[in-house]
From Swiss-Prot:
Binds 1 potassium ion per subunit. Exhibits a very high intrinsic GTPase hydrolysis rate. Involved in the addition of a carboxymethylaminomethyl (cmnm) group at the wobble position (U34) of certain tRNAs, forming tRNA-cmnm(5)s(2)U34. Its cofactor is K(+). Its EC number is 3.6.-.-. CDD domains: trmE (cd04164), TrmE_N (cd14858). Residues 219-372 form the TrmE-type G domain. One of its GO terms (biological process) is tRNA wobble uridine modification. It comes from the Bacteria. This is tRNA modification GTPase MnmE. It comes from Bordetella pertussis (strain Tohama I / ATCC BAA-589 / NCTC 13251). GTP binds at residues 229-234, 248-254, 273-276, 353-355.
Length: 450
């Protein structure tokens, strides 16, 4: 499969709509436009034209826009045909384009291939390319703003600034190593230690902001766990603001997980209602309980719901013992509206009434705190786990470099190597140093047509 052959795809989402777009990218598309329309197209002008089949039948009418390289999304020639958004019509337009461009090597695009070409042609760096997919997938205004900040290059600029400063330090170290006869005290003359301290401080700041970006993009997987009839389904409905889960007084009503995404201050939380945990002979309910424990194992946060009107029993103790130690657990005592006296809760617990709405605002804010979200922080750009991992790797190498800078013998070659590794970690974020396997994994997650 040639990376330079022209490609085509329907660029709009599946289904019916007012407008649908067929996008083509590749070299020398002026010839293809001539074949499709029998006339040349003026670059960057919208032409209202009929879209015809090979036998002259009019398939649709719409706008044809030709973008000449390099002034296009991909950096190649791009031809966009904007017609009506019916699936059958768009498939016919795409088929006609592929037929007309067959001898030119025109083929259907792979998922994410248009954006991959934009990256390879240096129209976008890798972090910006990922932001395209994040903008498409954004499920809240905050996530959309964060994705747009990344797409505009805000995150990449911060990474590039740190990379440039590390390169400058490396250059000075290498010069010192290459010309030992000059007897230059590198660490003193070029103030390497304070420079390194400033670098480390700025990188730590970037890591903290990246954590916020990861939370905004990926959210938190929150599992509601507890015995039957403690109010798990009622709490899910209260947080969602809708009757998502069935609520009855019958124990064991919920037998399989119910997942609902909610947003608190723009942060996505994936709330999972689960089957009540108890000993049972019911085969179907037993399957649901086993699935509950699997959900608990993969949770980012567990809300252990308990009924304040019922005293704890051996089953509560069994549940607590089996909860994974590595996962944060918030004890939530429900149905406080049914008590005659004020409830005296435990430390690190919350008292609520899912049906009465008592304590739900406090619960929402507590969820954000446990997620690590800082509402007072600067509005973040979106980040991915791989970005955060790369930043943390760079920080580790700078920490080791700092240790070498403190040594009396000043082992500059080791100092230089740690700077190189820190720089390599940072450039992996923007794609200046990235394996083909990683590129394939990233762009394969895109939708076709983008």
């Amino acid at each position: 499969m040639s990376l330079y052959a022209p490609i085509a795809a329907i660029a709009t989402a599946p289904g019916r709509g007012g407008i649908g777009v067929v996008r083509i990218s590749g070299p020398d598309l002026a010839e293809l436009a001539q074949r499709l329309f029998g006339r040349p197209l003026t670059p960057r002008h919208a032409h209202y034209l009929p879209f015809r089949a090979a036998d002259g039948e009019v398939i649709d009418e719409g706008l044809a826009i030709y973008f000449r390289a390099p002034h296009s999304y991909t950096g190649e020639d791009v031809l966009e045909l904007q017609g009506h958004g019916g699936p059958a019509v768009l498939r016919r337009i795409l088929a006609r384009c592929l037929q007309a461009g067959h001898d030119l090597g025109l083929r259907p695009a792979e998922p994410g291939e248009f954006t991959r070409r934009a990256f390879l042609n240096e129209r976008l760096d890798l972090a910006q390319a990922e932001a395209v997919a994040d903008l498409i997938d954004a499920s809240s205004e905050a996530a959309a703003r964060g994705a747009m900040a990344s797409l505009s290059g805000e995150f990449s600029q911060r990474v590039n600034d740190l990379s440039d400063r590390i390169i400058h330090l490396r250059m000075l170290v290498e010069a010192t190593l290459d010309f030992p006869e000059e007897e230059i005290d590198f660490l003193e003359k070029y103030q390497a230690r304070p420079t390194l301290q400033a670098l480390t401080h700025d990188l730590d700041t970037l890591i903290a902001q990246a954590r916020q970006g990861v939370i905004l993009r990926e959210g938190l997987h929150v599992v509601l766990a507890g015995k039957p009839n403690v109010g798990k389904s009622s709490l899910l409905n209260a947080l969602a603001g809708d009757d998502i889960a069935i609520v009855t007084p019958i124990a064991g009503t919920t037998r399989d997980k119910v997942v609902q995404e909610i947003h608190i201050d723009g942060v996505p939380l994936h709330i999972v209602d689960t089957a009540g945990l108890r000993d049972t002979d019911d085969a179907v309910e037993s399957i649901g309980i086993e699935r509950t424990w699997k959900e608990i194992e993969r949770a980012d946060l567990i809300l252990h719901l308990q009924d304040v009107t019922q005293p704890p029993d051996h089953l509560d103790a069994q549940i607590v013992r089996r909860l994974p130690a590595r996962t944060p657990v918030l004890n939530v005592f429900n149905k406080v509206d049914l008590l005659d006296a004020a409830f005296q809760g435990q430390p690190d617990s919350l008292a609520i009434s899912a049906r009465g709405g008592i304590g739900l605002d406090a619960l929402r804010q507590h969820l954000l705190q446990l997620a690590g979200w800082n509402p007072g922080a600067e509005s973040p750009w979106l980040a991915r786990e791989r970005h955060l991992h790369a930043l943390q790797q760079a920080a580790q190498h700078l920490e080791i470099a700092t240790e070498h800078a403190r040594e009396d013998d000043r082992v500059l070659d080791l100092f230089a190597e740690e700077l190189r590794l820190a720089h390599e970690a940072l450039t992996g974020i923007t794609g200046k140093f990235t394996s083909d396997d990683l590129l394939g994994e990233i762009f394969s997650s895109f939708c076709i047509g983008k």
